[in-house]
A protein has these predicted regions:
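Active-site SXXK
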Residues: 32, 46, 52, 76-105, ...
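N-terminal export signals
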Residues: 2-19
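Short, conserved catalytic-motif segment at the N-terminal edge
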Residues: 22-80, 101-103, 150-153, 354
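Short, glycine/proline-biased beta-turn/loop segments that scaffold the active-site neighborhood
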Residues: 103-118, 200-202
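Short, surface-exposed loop or secondary-structure junction motifs
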Residues: 57, 62-64, 118-321
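A short acidic/glycine-rich loop-to-helix N-cap element
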Residues: 350-363
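Short, surface-exposed beta-strand/loop micro-motifs that present aromatic residues
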Residues: 322, 329-342
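Structural recognition of the beta-strand scaffold that forms the well-ordered cores
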Residues: 45-47, 127-129, 333-334, 342-345
Length: 378
């Protein structure tokens, strides 16, 4: 069982394993096999959880194609990319909020005074968490800046593109800023804060920022960098990489066991069951229900996506009210409290040359739809 999970063993494995009579996960398995066969992804590790159990797990293809082929493995560690945002940075912010360190609707500049520059003085913590801040999608990478301090200067100098609260624009700058907020208020670097206050309570021993070089063979590589070196255990996101591998928007590495445990612990806490998840139930409910301005139709929780054009991992059957997130490298996690289910897909779709583009969008949608159908979600 995965109830209250930290690092706990899988209850069931393999295609077709299910918690309800007649459930058939063969269509899920076929979708994943076909994606590998077409070259849409080099390899994939996937899991479907339901009722506290893993009811399907799939491992297909290769975790590496270059410099030499390596078979995919359930224990492969992946660059989680933007899944860092809702799984690490947002809960870190909310832990500090639970402690009374700040309110969600206070200006960010109250805690980070330099953030007030360039018209950002009224942007709130909630607006960063929901991507309604008005800030641009990312820092400018056209100039050759390097280092955390250089990134901080650029964040503080960033000028909004539009008024806060006007429109949903997904922005890495929002979560870089939130990572800086966590560090400033807690007095800890974000990676150390996450290890101590999020990963350790959940028993996520295979997760963290800047993995040790000795773990390289267990990590799925992404693509060649500008120096023609294959990135492996080094964050793929170029902004996070320039920042040294630790940032609020990207940098987490993890594997299927740890991410499945995270998902189940969150669902358990949300439902009021026993759980190691390091936030209160009311906080989890707040994070996973719409928190954007009331008159806006792009629905965002605090860190989590609910109903926007990014919500393809919901598929065609899981309801609005389910929630999740994606990562650029080819990762996604979607959770449905109504059916007590989650769908986890881990790939390094950018390997080896940054290709394998929009096919991942269709794969996420189709796998979620097939999984929901197998679970009897209509």
């Amino acid at each position: 069982m995965l109830r209250g999970a930290g690092m706990l063993g899988l209850a069931l494995g393999g295609a077709g394993c299910a918690s309800r009579a007649g459930a058939d996960f063969a269509p899920v398995d076929s979708l994943l096999r076909d994606a590998v066969a077409r070259g849409d992804v080099p390899g994939v590790v996937a899991a479907v959880g339901h009722g506290g159990r893993i009811v399907y797990r799939g491992v297909h293809g290769h975790r590496a194609l270059l410099p030499a082929p390596e078979p995919e493995s359930w224990t492969t560690r992946f660059d989680m990319a933007s899944l860092t945002k809702p799984t690490i940075t947002a809960p870190a912010v909310m832990q500090l909020w639970e402690q009374g360190a700040f309110t969600l609707d206070e200006p960010v500049a109250r805690r980070l005074p330099a953030f007030a520059a360039a018209g950002k003085q009224d942007i709130t913590i909630r607006q960063l968490l929901t991507h309604y801040s008005g800030l641009a999608p990312d820092l400018d990478l056209a100039t050759p800046w390097q280092g955390r301090d250089a990134a901080v200067r650029r964040v503080m100098a960033a000028r909004p593109d539009r008024p806060a609260g006007e429109r949903f624009v997904y922005s890495d700058i929002n979560f870089i800023t939130l990572g800086l907020l966590v560090e400033t208020v807690s007095g800890l670097p974000l990676d150390r804060y996450a290890a101590r206050h999020i990963l350790a309570p959940l028993g996520m021993a295979h997760s963290g920022f800047r993995p040790d070089a000795a773990l390289g063979p267990e990590i799925a590589p992404t693509q060649f960098d500008d120096g023609n070196v294959m990135l492996r255990g080094v964050v793929h996101d170029p902004t996070a990489r320039r920042m040294g591998g630790v940032a609020g928007h990207a940098g987490l590495f993890s594997d299927a066991d740890d991410m499945a445990a995270y998902a189940q612990a969150l669902l358990d806490r949300r439902a009021g069951r026993g759980s190691a998840f390091p936030l209160k139930r009311g906080t989890v409910l707040l994070m996973t229900t719409p928190q954007q301005p009331a008159d806006r139709t792009d629905l965002r929780g605090l860190g989590w996506d609910i109903a926007t054009h990014y919500s393809t991992p919901r598929g065609d059957l899981f309801p609005v009210g389910s929630f999740g997130h994606t990562g650029f490298t080819g990762t996604s996690l979607w959770m449905d409290p109504a059916s007590d289910s989650f769908v986890l897909i881990l790939t390094n779709r950018v390997h080896p040359d940054g290709g394998h583009g929009r096919q991942i969008i269709r794969l996420r949608n189709d796998v979620a739809t097939a999984a929901a159908r197998a679970l009897g979600v209509t």
